[in-house]
Amino acid sequence: YAGAAPVELTHNVILGRDPNARVLTGRPAATVMRVPSPANEISRSHAAVMPSGFGSWMLMDLGSANGTLLRSSNGNVQDVPPRVTVALNDGDVIDLGENVLVEFIVR
């Protein structure tokens, strides 16, 4: 999101206004990435980005109150169903609401 430094992903990351590193049951503690939410429209633990093996990554909405959108690099926009993983591709943008956009870049 605007003003945030890039974060190198090596394991699970939880995105939210006050994320819980242990929200993913049965998985090791995750890195947390706090995002601004002045209107509290972004859930505390809103979404997770997780490795899926062989360099691929997945996005999961963690049952957030207002949902998560995935804006694909090809122009498609999709609602991410709660607790369902969807593939992330280079250039995709995770839309958490309140104009908080997280760009996924593969290097």
Q: Where are each of the predicted segments found?
A:
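Membrane-targeting and insertion segments and their boundary/processing signals
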Residues: 21, 61-62, 68
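C-terminal boundary/linker segments immediately following FHA domains
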Residues: 15, 54-56, 63, 71-107
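Short polybasic amphipathic segments
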Residues: 1, 66-70
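Intrinsically disordered, low-complexity acidic Ser/Thr-rich regulatory segments
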Residues: 1-40, 89, 100-107
